[in-house]
Amino acid sequence: MAIPSYKVRLETNEPITPNVRKLVFRLEDPKTITYKQGQFVSFMLGTEDGRPIKRSYSIANMETDGVDSTYIEFVISYVEGGKASELFFNAEPGKEMEMTGPFGLLCLTEELPKRVFLVGTGTGVAPYRSMIEQMRTRTDTEFHILFGAQYLEDMFYLDDFKAVALLDHVHFHPCLSREEKPGCFSGYVQHKLAELNPNPETDIAYLCGNPNMVDEVFEMLKDKDFGVKQVKREKYVFSRF
């Protein structure tokens, strides 16, 4: 089966932290894409030496469903010397690119347990933003969103996460590892998760972002007798090429 391919045009490219930009691409051909919240898309990028490279980014659209969407929003961190981040950070609106997808299984399942932990660092919270409208309606499940960053200025989409956390069954835990701020947990996301006492009998966890965080939290959950199917993982690897 052929992988769906799309021609897209950059609509907006704006900084949302000192090191992260938000990009919105409009679908040109075909005009729409169907995806599941939590999935990602890939871009084929041409480089100066003519060798194409592929980079993947989680869909951050915040919609009631992912059917027939006319745009794709994602966030990207700057990697010094990274060809992909240089290209995207400097891309001007109107730039045309080729996109494939959607891919990935980091999606909420039809049946959910008592508690769901959504753990992310940096741009690894993008798929959780796309799940916000699902969280609103799945009132039988208690959601805990854990967002890890070094400093408060490194965080984004805060208004969206705080808004959904006004609901009784949704909780937002911003975690800062390098500074103390009111309303934020001081420490790493794995430390906050441990405080919440995850239980394999009633909970599942989603992990996305820094590979070291993903591995450390996965080991912690395994020590608590979580099975592989109870922990969904997606690592973000930052490449300079």
Question: Which sequence ranges carry the predicted segments?
Answer:
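Ser/Thr-glycine-rich phosphate-binding loops at phosphate-binding pockets of nucleotides
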Residues: 121-125
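Reductase modules of NAD(P)H-dependent flavoproteins
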Residues: 2-7, 142, 146-241
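Conserved S-adenosyl-L-methionine
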Residues: 113, 136-143
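A short, basic/flexible loop-to-alpha-helix module at the beginning of a structural domain
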Residues: 101-112
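Histidine-anchored nucleotide/phosphate-binding helix
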Residues: 127-136
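Ferredoxin-reductase
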Residues: 2-93
